[in-house]
Amino acid sequence: MTFFESELSAKKRDQRRGFLFILSSPSGAGKSTLSRLLLKDAQLERSVSVTTRQRRPSEVDGFHYHFVSKQEFECKRDGDEFIEWAEVHGNYYGTLRKSVENALSAGRDILFDIDYQGTEQLQKKMPGDTVSIFILPPSMKELILRLHRRAEDSQDIINLRLKNAQTEMQHWRFYDYVVINKDLNQSASLIKSIYLAETARRKRCSFLESFVDGLIDEKIN
């Protein structure tokens, strides 16, 4: 464990404000898989979005998403309960404001798996608290293969995702980092490195002032 990883222990986390670590990509570029790999060995908590999308057989309500009706979603939206929300592929997605604010205040870092619309909202509302990465496929041919390989969507849905991918990829320049996902393990390693580097930013580490003062005052025999 590195110095800054150890400083992110439960003892130190309450001494700094957390941040939002955002991954975006067109469907099939590997965003969800990379998110799962990152959560295994990085000190991140996953943001669980609220959605009106139909639950897939492999998904668990409350873990992958909070699945709600369109009426329930609109009620929460109109009540200003979302810090960000968007309509993607004909479905609503949103992030509950209270859960995010509580996590950041407690010094916890939150992983977001959201599209460019949600990212833009978070960047505007919380500019000092966001770190964003856009994930690109190595080619459109590979993107098509991945969508078919997933075997969880109908052909009509796949066609819609491919059409929307062209719009989504135009927003890459508004992100802090861009990763071309040619190799899953290499991409995961790169993204973890970006996360660890961001935890070491001086502005995030309020404990450093007292730590350095202690070093300076420490007696040398």
Swiss-Prot record:
Q: List the disulfide bonds.
A: none
Keyword Manganese: yes or no? Answer: no
Q: What is its EC number?
A: 2.7.4.8
Question: Where mainly found?
Answer: cytoplasm
Gene3D superfamilies with a match to the protein in the record? Guanylate Kinase phosphate binding domain, P-loop containing nucleotide triphosphate hydrolases
Q: Which GO terms describe its cellular component?
A: cytosol
User: Which reactions fall under this protein's catalytic activity?
Assistant: GMP + ATP = GDP + ADP
Q: Tell me the domain of life.
A: Bacteria
Per UniProt, what is one Pfam family of this protein? Guanylate_kin
The cross-references to PANTHER family, in alphabetical order and at most eight, read:
GUANYLATE KINASE (PTHR23117:SF13), GUANYLATE KINASE-RELATED (PTHR23117)
Function (record text)? Essential for recycling GMP and indirectly, cGMP.
The UniProt similarity line reads: Belongs to the guanylate kinase family.
Name of the molecule in the record: Guanylate kinase
Origin species, per record, is Bartonella quintana (strain Toulouse)
